[in-house]
Every structure is written in C-alpha cells, then in structure tokens.
Amino acid sequence: MSHFEILSLEGLRNDGRRWDEMRNFQCRIGIEPSENGSAFIELGNTKVLCIVDGPSEPVIKSKARADRTFVNVEINIASFSTIDVKKRFKSDRRIQLQCLALQNTFEEIIQTELYPRSQISVYLHVLQDDGAVMASCINATTLALIDAGIPVKDFVCCSTAGIVESDMLLDLNSLEESALSWLTVAVLGNIKKVVYMQLETSMHLDYLESVMNMAIAGSEHIYNTMQSAVRQSAKPALASLS
C-alpha cells in the first residue's frame, strides 16, 4: 500500500483524520451489574467488553500464591469481529502471548499482596476489531478492575502509533496496522511511566522514540477520558453517602 493511500496530499488519512487525531473514544463502567466489575470500550469501530471476577479461590489450586493473588486473563475474539480472514483466524499462540502480557502488566499494578491465595479473573471479549485491540483490552481491564473495587496503584492507559515513510500517525485503524510499522504503548496515568510496549514489525531506530512519544501522548488523552468516566460512575455512590 502506497504512502498516498495511507496519508493523502492534503494530510488526511483514509478515515478522514489528520496524522495526530485519535478516533472517538468512549467508555462505560458497570454495564453488567451482576458481575464484580465490568467495562465497555469503544475506540472508533473497535469494541471490547471486559468482565472481572474475584478475588476468589483459585480454580487451579497449584496456581495459588501464598503472598499475593494470581491474575488470570482470557481473551475471546468474536468470529464476526473483523472481515479480515487472516485476522479472524489469528493463531492461538498470539492470543496466549497477549493474555500473558496482560497478566504480567496488571500483576504489577494491582495491589496483589492484599489478596493472598486468591485469583482475580479477567475476561475480555473483542466484539469488533478495527485496530488497537490490545490497547483497548488494557484500557477496558483498568476500568473493570476499578469497577470491581480492586485496589490498583494507578490507571494503566494505552494507545498506538505508527509511521509511514517519515510521517507519524496516532491511533492506527485496522487498515493502517496491516500496512505500517507501529507499536502499542501503555503508561501509568499519573506518572507516565511505560509499563508495556509491543512493536509490530520492524521500525528504524531513528523514529522509534518519536513514535513512542506520540503513543504516550495518545495514552494521556485516553487517561483523561477514563478518569472522567470513573468520576461519573462514582457520583451515585457518593450522593447516597451525603
């Protein structure tokens, strides 16, 4: 795919955005009242639902840890989530690696020492995939954990960025992901510390830092929206206490 199919002479992308524009980001918390925690993320056409269960007794006893909780992550990708056959049938190995990355990331963020010999289960349902799925899974997990009342050290906020020739792009859609070098970056909302980064395909070292900084800037935008959603969801509870 040529440069001009990704970014026109007028500086517009195939979905009408400029290089530094994000897609519309919306999030809802507590949409499944019967669950311990839940959150729904929409980033453009990408849609992810997260359900959190626990802390509870570990399903597999051997995974119980004497000094902290064990975080189990499962990702389910709906068969109708994308029209791209290659993406629809992505390998189980890739999904397992994504689950492991999410587990490692959130075991560092959750105050796991408060729940020894227990398990927190995170179930992610990718309902529609139009790019930035891993980022959306991370953002949805953060909100669902907060909704479940599980203590976390900070928000984990995530976004993507890529490069076409020497032009950087923020928040790639599915078409852009299939054609460009890009990365996913997650940071702690308050201190902007990078806690997760995944590079997809090769990228020239001269551009890596700039692309990473763009993804971090996108994560800051995500953080502000997520903070507002949490405050909004907490209003009824706070009102009942007054």
UniProtKB/Swiss-Prot annotation:
Key word RNA-binding present in the record? yes
Query: What InterPro entries does UniProt report for this protein, alphabetically?
Result: ExoRNase_PH_dom1, ExoRNase_PH_dom2, ExoRNase_PH_dom2_sf, PNPase/RNase_PH_dom_sf, Ribosomal_Su5_D2-typ_SF, RNase_PH
Q: Write down the SUPFAM superfamilies for this protein, in alphabetical order.
A: Ribonuclease PH domain 2-like, Ribosomal protein S5 domain 2-like
**Cellular localization per UniProt:** Cytoplasm; Nucleus, Nucleolus
Q: Which UniProt keywords apply?
A: Cytoplasm, Exosome, Nucleus, RNA-binding, rRNA processing
Q: What Pfam families does this protein's entry cite?
A: RNase_PH, RNase_PH_C
Hey, what's the signal peptide range on this chain? none
**Record-level GO cellular component terms:** chromatin; cytoplasmic exosome (RNase complex); cytosol; exosome (RNase complex); nuclear exosome (RNase complex); nucleolus; nucleus
* GO process annotations (BP): exonucleolytic trimming to generate mature 3'-end of 5.8S rRNA from tricistronic rRNA transcript (SSU-rRNA, 5.8S rRNA, LSU-rRNA); nonfunctional rRNA decay; nuclear mRNA surveillance; nuclear mRNA surveillance of mRNA 3'-end processing; nuclear polyadenylation-dependent mRNA catabolic process; nuclear polyadenylation-dependent rRNA catabolic process; nuclear RNA surveillance; nuclear-transcribed mRNA catabolic process, 3'-5' exonucleolytic nonsense-mediated decay
Instruction: Describe the task this protein carries out.
Output: Non-catalytic component of the RNA exosome complex which has 3'->5' exoribonuclease activity and participates in a multitude of cellular RNA processing and degradation events. In the nucleus, the RNA exosome complex is involved in proper maturation of stable RNA species such as rRNA, snRNA and snoRNA, in the elimination of RNA processing by-products and non-coding 'pervasive' transcripts, such as antisense RNA species and cryptic unstable transcripts (CUTs), and of mRNAs with processing defects, thereby limiting or excluding their export to the cytoplasm.
As for family, the record states: Belongs to the RNase PH family.
Provide the protein name.
Answer: Exosome complex component ski6
Species of the source: Schizosaccharomyces pombe (strain 972 / ATCC 24843) (Fission yeast)
